[in-house]
């Protein structure tokens, strides 16, 4: 038989546990505290609410209308997007654009080279430099849309418009060609007139030169004849004296007159 344990030990064992080190843990105290909190929880909540209501009423009576929002926490307001949207044909678009790493590096390198402080200025510069490419793209898009239209009537209208445009362009080109031809003809006519006048002036100059040359030759020939006649008179014997000399002088004078008459006739024929 086991030895009987005293009642004091039994009651003690019911309310305590002995651990390995000999210390006693009071289970009754732990459980009693738990039961107290659970049993008195509704009472505590009601008293807390009553106290809050009393404080609120007291503040209203005293003239302090405080906001009871601290007692009831509210949700924080969601931050609105301060960037406005842009409405396009594809719908609203955000003004902010996300770039890849490589494109972002190139973009900011270009911005540093240009010396701009805002990315929008860099984009504006790029758009202005690519105006011709944008125009070509718009024209290609418009031609594609016109060519891909399913309506036959629309195609006929487009073809008629293109024919009218081609005819109009041909008419303009013909007018321009006619104007160019008229200008060329007038220029050529003026050039022909100037050349004809130049040739006439050249002929006149040559005639004058020929006349002067012939006169000079005639003068030289006459001087030579005078010299020859003077030497002949020195060798002639004065057989008849004065009559012979007068005959020689009259003969020379008659020859010179006939020579000058012939030369004048030639000059008149040339002129």
From Swiss-Prot:
Top-level taxon of origin: Eukaryota
Function of the molecule: Involved in the dorsovental asymmetry of flowers. Retards growth rate and reduces organ number in the dorsal region of flowers.
GO biological process entries: regulation of secondary shoot formation
TCP domain residues: 79-137
Record PANTHER family: TRANSCRIPTION FACTOR TCP1, TRANSCRIPTION FACTOR TCP4-RELATED
InterPro entries: CYC/TB1_R_domain, TF_TCP_subgr, Transcription_factor_TCP
Keywords: Developmental protein, DNA-binding, Nucleus, Transcription, Transcription regulation
Organism, as annotated: Antirrhinum linkianum (Snapdragon)
Protein name as annotated: Transcription factor CYCLOIDEA
GO annotations of cellular component type: nucleus
Gene Ontology MF, one: sequence-specific DNA binding
PROSITE patterns assigned: R, TCP
Compartment(s): Nucleus
Chain's gene name: CYC
């Amino acid at each position: 038989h086991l030895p009987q344990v005293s009642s004091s030990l039994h009651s003690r064992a019911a309310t305590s546990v002995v651990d390995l080190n000999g210390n006693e843990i009071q289970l009754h105290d732990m459980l009693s505290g738990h039961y107290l909190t659970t049993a008195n929880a509704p009472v505590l909540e009601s008293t807390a609410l009553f106290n809050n209501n009393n404080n609120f009423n007291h503040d209203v009576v005293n003239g302090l209308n405080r906001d009871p929002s601290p007692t009831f926490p509210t949700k924080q307001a969601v931050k609105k997007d301060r960037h406005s949207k842009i409405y396009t044909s594809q719908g609203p678009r955000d003004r902010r654009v996300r770039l890849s790493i490589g494109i972002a590096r190139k973009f900011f390198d270009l911005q540093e080279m240009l010396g701009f402080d805002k990315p929008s200025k860099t984009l504006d510069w790029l758009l202005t430099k690519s105006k011709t490419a944008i125009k070509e793209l718009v024209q290609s898009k418009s031609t594609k849309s016109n060519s891909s239209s399913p309506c036959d009537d629309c195609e006929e209208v487009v073809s008629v418009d293109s024919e009218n445009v081609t005819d109009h362009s041909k008419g303009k080109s013909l007018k321009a060609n006619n104007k160019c031809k008229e200008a060329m003809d007038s220029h050529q006519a003026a050039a022909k007139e100037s050349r004809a006048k130049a040739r006439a002036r050249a002929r006149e100059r040559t005639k004058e030169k020929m006349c002067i040359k012939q006169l000079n030759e005639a003068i030289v020939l006459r001087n030579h004849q005078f010299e020859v006649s003077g030497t002949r008179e020195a060798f002639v014997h004065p057989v008849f004296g004065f009559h012979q000399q007068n005959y020689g002088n009259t003969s020379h004078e008659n020859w010179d007159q006939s020579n000058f008459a012939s030369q004048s006739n030639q000059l008149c024929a040339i002129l």
